[in-house]
Swiss-Prot record:
GO molecular function: GTP binding; GTPase activity; metal ion binding
Statement: the UniProt record of this protein carries the keyword Magnesium: yes
Predominant subcellular localization, coarse grouping: cytoplasm
Keywords noted in UniProt: Cytoplasm, GTP-binding, Hydrolase, Magnesium, Metal-binding, Nucleotide-binding, Potassium, tRNA processing
A GO CC term attached to the entry: cytoplasm
Entry annotated with the keyword Membrane: no
Protein's name according to its UniProt entry: tRNA modification GTPase MnmE
Family membership noted in the UniProt record: Belongs to the TRAFAC class TrmE-Era-EngA-EngB-Septin-like GTPase superfamily. TrmE GTPase family.
Gene source species: Magnetococcus marinus (strain ATCC BAA-1437 / JCM 17883 / MC-1)
């Protein structure tokens, strides 16, 4: 589908493709019609010879000097320059990349020179937006690109990279095409109702809608995994005060993030640490000791702890091995969702003999012991966490829904499909069924960006960095 860009997007833009700040290398990216002609006047060979546009071979680096017109005697920078003629570029337009040194003052001056010569500073995500308008990617692929840039784990990066190749887009397009075909059969039933043509039966239309409904439902079933890939698997460490929660938090995070003392109630607020285990990001949360308290500040911390327990993907319940199951432990366990909890007996170094008995109905595979003081058993705790993580499904087809916008749009589409199904099942006029059906098609069209909804496009591309 041809997408029509806004008028201001026909000019030439410049932006940094590398992070700002001092570095060994900085890459400036330019895009727009005839952009090479705007850069060439400032480029010279190492021997001081002027450079012609015809001297550039597509996608071949050239070692050149950038000359500041205000100080032409000394090169402003020595760089590698490459030209990407349209349409064989990231944006689909003529593009030039300047690979120079990462001195902020030099980069700033180069941009000032080029902006004075007719180039405009790029808006956030404008290069990707132009790529979208030039059919180099659809909106789902653009979101996958941003997901790859922001990935905090290998698993999230791999899934985003997979979706950049168009796998998710292909699944969505197949479902949309099936909806369009269903609509065509419905229209045929309306248009040729008086002709000697056998239209699709209402049962056949329902079967087609059921197929699309099941496909979207399957995609929505991956949204929770997508959230965990994007934001991390949240693991809350909970238990009575002074059982070693903060010590375990520090041991797992590999640094002394939480204060550890022998005083009960030391931790009053949440401590967080980002980890990566088996390619999946983990948000580890140390919580306040759970108990009854008259201290108003501690009560706030305890309330926050229970809130995190409710939203956490997994829970590590810590108890003291030498004491066994206390009455306080039993009271806490009544409020904990056992299906997502790991029982950790801490302070093994103070225990003589075997681990104490847990509650009778507690699964054995969800129990382990550790000494945060000596490090004994820490690998076992990590192994149990990994076992919990490995229960998450793998989606090798690249159909994990990782963006909230995608999830919400699919949810709206499925509501409309269900509305059409109900109307058909109740024998309502086909003219009425066509309305929710066309709206569901619009939802899938909007999802991939084949639409003129400028607010949707702005929402997606505004989250990008300038150089993308």
């Amino acid at each position: 589908m041809l997408r029509t860009p806004l008028l201001h997007e026909q000019d030439c833009i410049i932006g940094m493709a590398t992070p700002p700040g001092t570095s060994g290398v900085a890459v400036l990216r330019l895009s727009g019609p005839g952009v090479l002609s705007l850069v060439v006047p400032y480029l010279y060979t190492p021997k001081g010879e002027k450079v012609a546009e015809s001297g550039f071979k597509p996608r071949v680096m050239r070692r050149l000097n950038f000359i500041d017109p205000q100080a032409p005697d000394v090169p402003l920078d020595h760089m590698l320059v490459v030209h990407f003629p349209n349409p064989h570029s990231f944006s689909g337009e003529d593009m030039v990349e300047l690979h120079g040194h990462g001195a902020p003052v030099v980069v700033k001056r180069i941009m000032e020179v080029l902006v004075a010569h007719g180039v405009r500073p790029a808006d956030p995500g404008e290069f990707s937006k132009r790529a979208f308008f030039n059919n180099k990617m659809d909106l789902v692929q653009a979101e996958a690109l941003m997901g790859l840039i922001e990935a905090t784990s290998l698993r999230a990066a791999r899934e985003a990279s997979r979706q950049m190749t168009g796998t998710l887009s292909e699944h969505l397009m197949a479902l949309k095409d099936h909806l369009v075909l269903t609509y065509a059969h419905l229209e045929a039933a309306l248009d040729f109702s008086d002709e000697d043509i056998e239209p699709e039966s209402e049962g056949g239309l329902l079967d087609r809608l059921a197929y699309v409904h099941a496909g979207i439902k399957k995609m929505l079933g991956t949204a929770e995994l997508g959230r965990q890939m994007r934001d991390g698997f949240e693991l809350a460490i909970v238990g009575r005060p002074n059982v070693g929660k903060s010590s375990l938090f520090n041991a797992l995070s590999g640094e002394d993030r939480a204060i550890v003392t022998d005083l009960a109630g030391t931790t009053r607020d949440l401590n967080e640490s980002n980890l990566e285990i088996h390619g999946l990001p983990i948000l580890l949360v140390d919580t306040a000791g759970l108990r009854e308290s008259d201290d108003p500040v501690e009560r706030i911390g305890i309330e926050r702890a229970w809130q995190r327990v409710e939203r956490a993907d997994g829970i590590v319940f810590v108890a003291e091995a030498q004491l066994g199951v206390t009455l306080e432990d039993k009271a806490l366990l009544q409020r904990l969702p056992k299906e997502k909890a790991l029982w950790v007996w801490n302070k093994l170094d103070q225990l003589e003999g075997a681990l104490p008995e847990c509650l009778q109905d507690w699964p054995e595979e969800q129990i382990c012991g550790v000494s945060c003081h000596t490090g004994e058993g820490l690998e076992s705790v990590v192994a149990h966490i990994v076992a919990r993580m490995e229960q998450l499904p793998e989606h090798g087809e690249g159909v994990v829904i990782m963006q909230l916008r995608q999830q919400q749009t699919l949810q709206q589409a499925i509501v409309l499909i269900e509305e059409a199904q109900e109307m058909l099942a109740n024998g309502q006029w086909l003219e009425l069924v066509a309305e929710p059906l066309t709206r569901s098609i619009d939802q899938l069209t909007q999802l991939m960006g084949n639409t003129d909804y400028e607010d949707v496009l702005g929402m997606v591309f505004s989250s990008f960095c300038v150089g993308k």
